[in-house]
Amino acid sequence: FRHWLTALPDARQQGKVVYNKIFCIWSALSIFMQALGSRRQFDREAVADAARTTHVLLDNLNQLAGTEQQDILHGDALDDYLCSLPSCHLEQIPPKMVQRLIRMRALDYARLFGLYLIVIDATGIGHYHKRHCRHCLTQKRNGKILYYHLVLEAKLITPEGMVFSIGSEFVENSDPSATKQDCELAALPRLAAKIKERFPRLPICVLLDALYANHNVMALCDHYQWHRIISFKATRLPTAFREFHTLKSLCPENTLVTRIDDRYQRLSWVDDLQHDNHRFTGFDCLTYNDDGEQIYFAWLTDLPLNARTVVTLANHGGRKRWTIENQGFNNQKHQGYELEHAYSENNNAAKNYYFILQIAHALLQLLTHGLVAAAFKSVIGTMKNFFIRFADSLRHELISPRAVCPEACAPIQIRLAPT
């Protein structure tokens, strides 16, 4: 990890640089890993550490960065470096982390029929009542113009709910002469090209919501040889959806009723449906209990479906699309990472903070599902408690030099197990 940070460029005037670039990145990571929520709170913690007899937070940041800084930098100094660092460099680190996990086979258990599940979806990362920058997207609401920023994310997901970013594409207005705003459908080909370049031979199944149920997206998946499971709704493919429900009643042999825990599931599938020149299988799942509560989902896929695979594809494939929303976006917005907070007024720096947040989230997921997994369940319990204990440890307990020594850590391999 440190050699990736060492390779980052530094455009600052070198004769006047006080804080090492790696120290800057670890300082930014500590904002998210301590759930501080802002640069201002980071400054308060730096002042508190300087007032103590022993400066444990400073020593630990130096230990992690391999530096010998004399004090913790101010949040504005951190922002200066991230303003000068082109965001394309930090953008490469989250997918490199995933590549490393794949090479050490730590994520093999997460495959579904040999395929890694990649969820692609967009989320808002900032909303403003005034124009924030020239890249802002705009939307009229109640007669007023809302300015906002959007990012299209691709995350590799695991059965127990871990999410790792493998690609990000910011949806933003970059051409002043354009007659249309950028949108997530337009951003998808850009994101897909990045993923294919970084993971050219990775066996992938993409999970997408109904917005992407169209000819262009299916053609894109075919071009990159990606399998797909896409939400299937009448509002997006009305003709194919009507045909699916008509044929479903004529194929009773393609229906399976099963029970999972206290709920029943009725699953049906119809092969050889068509949209334009794309053929696919439609399948759905009606989940209900003894009290009459019902939940309905439907999907389309190019994967082979039968009575042996439909339960797995529905429950561990199609329904897992929500992982990016629940364990990804919601956690990053509300569990202490404060994804929607404006960490910088500079657009380039804001992107860098976004990528650093993805790195911090990945590191903490590996920690809570790996080294301290047992203690997390039995003692810590919640992420809120974890952030409190982690921050307390970072401020008051010195990290062993051996724990961050590259030579000592080289033989270590991460092993995760399904829950």
Cite the ranges covered by each PLM segment:
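Electropositive, glycine- and tryptophan-enriched low-complexity nucleic-acid-binding patches
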Residues: 140-203
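Short, conserved catalytic/metal-binding motifs centered on acidic residues
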Residues: 27-28, 42-43, 74, 114-125, ...
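Active-site-proximal, Lys/Arg-enriched surface segment
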Residues: 75-160
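Domain-level cores of phosphate- or acyl-group-handling catalytic modules
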Residues: 178-239
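A short, flexible helix-boundary coil/loop motif
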Residues: 8, 47-49, 57, 254-271, ...
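An anionic, glycine-rich sequence signature occurring as long contiguous blocks
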Residues: 227-321
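Short amphipathic alpha-helical "interface-anchor" segments enriched in bulky aromatics
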Residues: 1, 308-343
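Gly/serine-rich nucleotide phosphate-binding loop at the start of the catalytic core
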Residues: 1-70
